[in-house]
Amino acid sequence: MTNVTGTERVKRGMAEMQKGGVIMDVVNAEQAKIAEEAGAVAVMALERVPADIRAAGGVSRMADPTIVEEVMGAVSIPVMAKCRIGHLVEARVLESLGVDYIDESEVLTPADEVYHLNKRDYTVPFVCGCRDIGEAARRIAEGASMLRTKGEPGTGNIVEAVRHMRQVNAEIRQVASLREDELMTYAKNTGAPYEVLLEIKRLGRLPVVNFAAGGVATPADAALMMQLGADGVFVGSGIFKSENPEKFARAIVEATTHYEDYELIASLSKGLGNAMKGVEISTLLPEQRMQERGW
């Protein structure tokens, strides 16, 4: 990338191009090809999908660059990769590999418990998770070009993604209704930068796209998130932890596109086989809740 391609306007525009699509987690070239053939608009290259990261425990880090390069060489669609929150070097390594987007992700073990990356220092666009408008606005102020709900990754349980999408959208409506002289107090109470809130008020929406992520496991889940206002869908473990990844991938892409066509979604949901095994959120210990990572 050149410095020109690294401007905020261009980076946000690149993320906007993925709007309405599905981004799938993959761990090798074979999975990347399945995702591309199913109609994914991009893939996320990593060593393990979130369900396996959750099961393995321990410290989870950036993927081996060999895996990232293997995926990049296998598909023509954009390739994303994850770095740990606050890990300056992992982000620079991924940028040097030529990935199309970097996800500063709570799925991996945070490297810094105080600071997120200053994403404006990079030419590559960044994706970040959020649960509310405070987190969303802080990530935007840091230079994030795309947001996604945090949900609860690797659970196959959509409830947290629904909660986060509804929360962000409700707070956007609240910001839009405030007078400008009321925004400063709102900024103080939420930790949201005032200038970003002004931009949200002026636009009536976030200035970057906001995808759904964290728990999407079925075509109906994907359609639900689109109806709640998501600009697109990330699917982590839901594809390749299902009984039939090829069928699930195609069905989720179709349901994301035609999210109000209930007869089609019913048809897409027939004969898919078992979805990934789900996890009840209330059974997770506080330290197992990935959505709590980041600030």
UniProtKB/Swiss-Prot annotation:
Protein residues bound to D-ribose 5-phosphate: 25, 154, 215, 236-237
One GO process term, biological-process aspect: pyridoxine biosynthetic process
GO molecular function annotations of the record: amine-lyase activity; pyridoxal 5'-phosphate synthase (glutamine hydrolysing) activity
Active site: 82
Enzyme kind, highest EC tier: lyase
Domain of life: Bacteria
EC number in record: 4.3.3.6
Keywords carried by this UniProt record: Lyase, Pyridoxal phosphate, Schiff base
Gene3D superfamilies referenced in this protein's UniProt entry, alphabetically: Aldolase class I (3.20.20.70)
Reaction catalyzed: aldehydo-D-ribose 5-phosphate + D-glyceraldehyde 3-phosphate + L-glutamine = pyridoxal 5'-phosphate + L-glutamate + phosphate + 3 H2O + H(+)
Residues involved in D-glyceraldehyde 3-phosphate binding: 166
SUPFAM superfamilies: Ribulose-phoshate binding barrel
The protein's annotated pathway: Cofactor biosynthesis; pyridoxal 5'-phosphate biosynthesis
InterPro entries reported for this sequence: Aldolase_TIM, PdxS/SNZ, PdxS/SNZ_N, RibuloseP-bd_barrel
Coiled-coil residues: none
Record-linked NCBIfam families: PRK04180.1, pyridoxal 5'-phosphate synthase lyase subunit PdxS
Record note on quaternary structure: In the presence of PdxT, forms a dodecamer of heterodimers.
Family per record: Belongs to the PdxS/SNZ family.
Record function comment: Catalyzes the formation of pyridoxal 5'-phosphate from ribose 5-phosphate (RBP), glyceraldehyde 3-phosphate (G3P) and ammonia. The ammonia is provided by the PdxT subunit. Can also use ribulose 5-phosphate and dihydroxyacetone phosphate as substrates, resulting from enzyme-catalyzed isomerization of RBP and G3P, respectively.
The name this protein goes by in its record: Pyridoxal 5'-phosphate synthase subunit PdxS
Source species: Bacillus cereus (strain ATCC 14579 / DSM 31 / CCUG 7414 / JCM 2152 / NBRC 15305 / NCIMB 9373 / NCTC 2599 / NRRL B-3711)
